[in-house]
């Protein structure tokens, strides 16, 4: 809703008096090959993942530039660096968010506004559970790192959520990156290794993905920050 977005900065300022940080984090996906994806599904993901980021940034940027120090934080993904099958629309949005944000980093140099592009690795969220699945007639679910080919959508979503870094830890990494003025913020060792792999072997990184994901999945800290015992 572009009109609602245009009105949002004034509502925020009326309630809080100022705005210093804008986090563009909303994201959805669809599990579908490109040839069988209905156009409305494609457009919906583009609207949420890309146009939402652009419209929110456009709406808030004039107010942020009036602050002595401010930041825009846009969430891309490791899927803004690499590509896998059945995620063409998600990749299209996340590569675009990356390009948009990195251009904005350069445009905002010399102003009071920092701009950050976030590349999360495997974070334990409900994005896979909430994803629409579109399969051609007779097509089975592809086997993946997180489950069997015959696993249900719910089982795959549960495995994805339970084996990822807890979202509270991801949030802490983002805040630390903003404080340290990092234009690129990688969340998790998997994100850092994937970035390295696609730089070293841009056409064959997919063969390295199991070696990256599986060991990290076993040792990743999945506890929420608030669940950790207090230090003595």
Region locations from a protein language model:
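A glycine-rich helix->loop->beta "capping" turn
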Residues: 11-22, 30
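The beta1-alpha1 cofactor-binding region of Rossmann-like NAD(H)/NADP(H)-dependent oxidoreductases
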Residues: 1-7, 39
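Active-site helix of classical SDR
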Residues: 57, 93
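Substrate-binding pocket helix/loop in short-chain dehydrogenase/reductase
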Residues: 33-34, 38-43
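SDR active-site lid
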Residues: 110-189
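Active-site loop immediately N-terminal to the catalytic Tyr-X3-Lys motif
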Residues: 35, 82-89
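Residue(s) in the substrate-gating loop at a strand-loop-helix junction
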Residues: 77
């Amino acid at each position: 809703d572009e009109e609602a977005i245009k009105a949002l900065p004034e509502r925020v300022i009326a309630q809080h008096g100022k705005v210093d940080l804008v986090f563009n984090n909303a994201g959805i996906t669809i599990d579908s090959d490109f040839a069988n994806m209905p156009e409305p599904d494609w457009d919906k993901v583009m609207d949420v993942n890309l146009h939402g980021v652009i419209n929110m940034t456009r709406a808030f940027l004039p107010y942020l530039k009036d602050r002595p120090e401010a930041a825009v934080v846009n969430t891309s993904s490791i899927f803004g660096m690499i590509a896998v099958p059945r995620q063409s629309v998600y990749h299209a949005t996340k590569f675009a968010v990356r390009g948009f944000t990195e251009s904005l980093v350069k445009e905002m140099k010399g102003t009071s506004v920092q701009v950050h592009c976030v590349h999360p690795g495997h974070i334990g969220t409900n994005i896979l559970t909430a994803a629409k699945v579109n399969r051609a007639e007779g097509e089975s679910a592809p086997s993946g790192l997180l489950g069997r080919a015959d696993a249900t959508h719910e089982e795959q979503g549960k495995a994805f959520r339970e084996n990822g870094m807890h979202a509270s830890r991801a949030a802490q990494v983002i805040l630390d990156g903003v404080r340290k003025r990092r234009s690129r913020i990688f969340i998790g060792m998997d994100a850092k290794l994937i970035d390295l792999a696609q730089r070293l072997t841009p056409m064959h990184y997919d063969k390295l993905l199991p070696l990256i994901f599986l060991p990290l999945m076993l040792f990743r800290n999945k506890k929420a920050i608030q669940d950790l015992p207090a230090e003595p």
